[in-house]
Amino acid sequence: VAVRMQYTNSTKINSEHLTAESTYTMRHNAFAFGASFVDLEVDVPIGKIKINRVIAIHDSGQILNPALARAQVHGGVAMGIGYALTEQMLFDPETGKMRNDNLLDYKIPTAMDIPQIDVEFVETYEPSAPFGNKALGEPPMIPQAPAIRNAVLHATGVAVYELPLTPERLIHAFIQAGLIQPLSCEHIAET
């Protein structure tokens, strides 16, 4: 719905509402495809992941607005990084209430956490879509967690099967794999 407003010298505003309605029924669902490649470093003793670069490649049909499409992919990559590394809903086991129900405690990535992101599009025409395009809203988020997890596996040889890849989970997996030794209380007392 759009409104055209006409201002006159008086305090009275003349407005005319403009409305339009149209529908388009797709005959079938157009599937978007994407892949991501992640270059990262793992600080094994402290379970810290530093992502250096993400290459995100997407087939979203004909790209109608390249700048907006790139921005959409950047946002999706950032969301995927948060899902893979930090975002986790914690609940109180007795009350069932969410313990991290605010942005101070529920950790989402900031601009400082997002690496260099290179975006490439494979443009294919989708005949069932009105302009030959496909989805580009959520698809860029989806491959990030598997790409990050597989990069950690490639870097360390350790497969982790639960997200997010928090330092606690990584350290536990690295101890189980024998990459690091657990610290004993005696060792801590000596230092």
Please tell me what each predicted stretch does.
Residues 1-191:
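C-terminal catalytic domains of large/alpha subunits in multi-subunit enzymes
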